[in-house]
């Protein structure tokens, strides 16, 4: 019997699609993972961003990130299904090893997430000091 391992899947969906089509593509990927025996632990939808270079002649992509646990054999089955989905510009599934998880903890310890309460508090303090200086 195979043991479940932790994986992360990063997706770039065609950003020119309507919100409903993007939601359908996300639901498809999540459904495939769960139907094949995986268990989704977190979903982070980053949103529309400009790509670094054109992918399939598209320059805007909708970025999303899914963390899940699954057996090794499930990954090939999931890739087989999502590989031919036309709305997905790119995808990458990687196994999260203990070294990667440790590195992630160190990065999170020393970084502030953009849009976090700490970040907005710093921005408000900077804006307040600018108005006082004027």
Swiss-Prot record:
Classification via CDD domains: bS6 (cd00473)
Keyword entries, A-Z: Ribonucleoprotein, Ribosomal protein, RNA-binding, rRNA-binding
GO biological process: translation
Organism superkingdom: Bacteria
CC per GO annotation: cytoplasm; ribonucleoprotein complex; ribosome
GO molecular function per UniProt: small ribosomal subunit rRNA binding; structural constituent of ribosome
InterPro entries named among the record's database cross-references: Ribosomal_bS6, Ribosomal_bS6_sf, Ribosomal_S6_plastid/chlpt, Transl_elong_EF1B/ribsomal_bS6
Pfam families according to UniProt: Ribosomal_S6
UniProt keyword annotation of RNA-binding present: yes
The keyword RNA-binding is annotated on this UniProt entry: yes
NCBIfam families reported in the protein's UniProt record: S6 (TIGR00166)
PANTHER family for this protein: MITOCHONDRIAL 28S RIBOSOMAL PROTEIN S6, SMALL RIBOSOMAL SUBUNIT PROTEIN BS6M
Function: Binds together with bS18 to 16S ribosomal RNA.
Family per record: Belongs to the bacterial ribosomal protein bS6 family.
Name by which UniProt lists this protein: Small ribosomal subunit protein bS6
Originating organism: Pelodictyon phaeoclathratiforme (strain DSM 5477 / BU-1)
């Amino acid at each position: 019997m195979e043991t479940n391992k932790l994986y992360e899947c990063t997706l770039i969906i065609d950003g020119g699609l309507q919100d409903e089509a993007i939601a359908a593509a996300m639901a498809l990927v999540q459904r495939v993972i769960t139907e094949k025996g995986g268990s989704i632990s977190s979903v982070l939808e980053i949103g529309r961003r400009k790509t670094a270079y054109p992918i399939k002649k598209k320059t805007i992509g909708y970025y999303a990130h899914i963390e899940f646990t699954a057996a090794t054999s499930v990954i090939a089955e999931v890739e087989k299904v999502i590989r031919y989905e036309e709305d997905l510009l790119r995808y990458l599934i990687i196994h999260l090893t203990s070294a990667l998880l440790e590195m992630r903890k160190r990065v999170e310890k020393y970084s502030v997430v953009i849009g976090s309460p700490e970040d907005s508090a710093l921005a408000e303090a900077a804006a307040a000091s600018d108005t006082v200086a004027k």
